Amino acid sequence: MTMEMHATTIFAVQHQGQSAMCGDGQVTLGNSVVMKHKAKKVRTLYNGKVLAGFAGSVADAFTLFEKFETKLQSFNGNLTRASVELAQEWRSDKVLRKLEAMLIVMNKEHMYLVSGTGEVIEPDDGILAIGSGGNYALSAGRALVRYADNMSAADIARSALEVAGEICVFTNDQITLEVLE
């Protein structure tokens, strides 16, 4: 299954004891019409202890947020276990398998990319990005972590997404930023 992620960028970073995630607000119908400018694609879950962001179909993402939050509750906030269980259910369920979205989930200790093909990937460097502007944000974020160590995780996240928005036509500058201290 090939996933084409359009109309969004989600970026997450763990840096100097902080965890930050941000997403842009653009929702695009097809490749030509911007339907919404201020969508909120990053959320806090589990009493503010977990951040989650999605790229892909909005309806599919709401389904996945709900399923993921249920898994978090079932496993008492264990992010790793909830992520693995969601990926397994997503991959094996005939209806869920058709959902076209990807998630980044994180707490203070871990972050994962979770997909419908069963992947649960924890990055080596504490940085993840998904969506149409993901590669641009990832590149900018890695450079900032390496060479601007005076920046906070929140500043890195916002700056990386701003760079992506300058390059990717499916990413705008209406940024939602959430931070775990």
From Swiss-Prot:
Regulation: Allosterically activated by HslU binding.
Enzyme Commission no: 3.4.25.2
Source taxon at top rank: Bacteria
Active site: 8
GO MF term list: metal ion binding; threonine-type endopeptidase activity
Entry similarity comment: Belongs to the peptidase T1B family. HslV subfamily.
Subunit structure: A double ring-shaped homohexamer of HslV is capped on each side by a ring-shaped HslU homohexamer. The assembly of the HslU/HslV complex is dependent on binding of ATP.
Name this protein carries in UniProt: ATP-dependent protease subunit HslV
UniProt source species: Oceanobacillus iheyensis (strain DSM 14371 / CIP 107618 / JCM 11309 / KCTC 3954 / HTE831)
